[in-house]
Amino acid sequence: MKISRSLSTVEVHTGGEAFRIVTSGLPRLPGDTIVQRRAWLKENADEIRRALMFEPRGHADMYGGYLTEPVSPTADFGVIFLHNEGYSDHCGHGVIALSTAAVELGWVQRTVPETRVGIDAPCGFIEAFVQWDGEHAGPVRFVNVPSFIWRRDVSVDTPSFGTVTGDIAYGGAFYFYVDGAPFDLPVREAAVEKLIRFGAEVKAAANAKYPVVHPEIPEINHIYGTIIANAPRHPGSTQANCCVFADREVDRSPTGSGTGGRVAQLYQRGVLAAGDTLVNESIVGTVFKGRVLRETMVGDIPAVIPEVEGSAHICGFANWIVDERDPLTYGFLVR
């Protein structure tokens, strides 16, 4: 056997959504910012992402992150998020997974009852706080990036569902937020094929019609996914939502950055008051909580700083190899 690459990972899930943390095996990443390092990876070593996200090592809905050195003085480490289509700007479920792993595995100095974890991401610095009893990590809350409504009541035309109206909001990534009830889209596992078709059509139409650009981070310049909300299954939940993102990927968690954007959307529309908590349910029934910490501005756009809370669990450790003689060296996808 001729091993051309060996990679080590920690396998975590957040509310059911996989997050594969790559801890070793990457080349040294040039660049003074996480965005620059991500750009270098995309141009020079994208086969690593494909090997870890695609079958047979991964699957069409796989998600993960590369650990890298921090770029800001208060961060413990940096992360580059990756998925089936490429690389993302933010990943709230990934922040929760990374923070849990960092505390459980001793990557940071642990304190009782809560341990702080600082993470540099493409969207900026994220500060998380992990409950720690001296033996086990518990729920994680993180202070999200400034979040805001970019456009209200915008419409797109789709091939299968006609005209769809919603808001475009930002919570670390841009999403098109829409009510699923008028389209008979329950947020349940049994409806996943219809949810995927709807979400993919809306995302494609929205990106074609609305050229979004973050006012302070010009590299964030596309609509990452569609978030479809409807009635929850649990009495204590405010809503359920399903995020269809990247290349028709379905988030099993309630979506961390999407929850941040939803908090901003509801607050700026007067639906969620200061001090209220959004209990956001996923397609599999797991829950994130979100609330507004304070108001702020992003350029000339009114925004809020949300806090998002959820839980993650380590479910494995793995060593992966790439054998250049393998005809499926860097993987494939079957949808």
Swiss-Prot record:
SUPFAM superfamilies the record matches: Diaminopimelate epimerase-like (SSF54506)
Keyword Disulfide bond carried by entry: no
Catalysed reaction, written as an equation: trans-3-hydroxy-L-proline = 1-pyrroline-2-carboxylate + H2O
Domain of life: Bacteria
Catalytic site: C91
InterPro entries: Hydroxyproline_Metab_Enz (IPR053425), Pro_racemase_fam (IPR008794)
GO molecular-function terms, A-Z: trans-L-3-hydroxyproline dehydratase activity
Assigned EC number: 4.2.1.77
Keyword terms of this UniProt record: Lyase
Residues the entry annotates as binding substrate: G92, H93, D251, G256, S257
The family this protein is said to belong to: Belongs to the proline racemase family.
NCBIfam families xrefs: TransHydProDhtase
Stated role: Catalyzes the dehydration of trans-3-hydroxy-L-proline (t3LHyp) to Delta(1)-pyrroline-2-carboxylate (Pyr2C). Is likely involved in a degradation pathway that converts t3LHyp to L-proline. Displays neither trans-4-hydroxy-L-proline (t4LHyp) epimerase nor proline racemase activity.
Protein name as catalogued: Trans-3-hydroxy-L-proline dehydratase
Source organism per UniProt: Burkholderia ambifaria (strain ATCC BAA-244 / DSM 16087 / CCUG 44356 / LMG 19182 / AMMD)
Species lineage: Bacteria, Pseudomonadati, Pseudomonadota, Betaproteobacteria, Burkholderiales
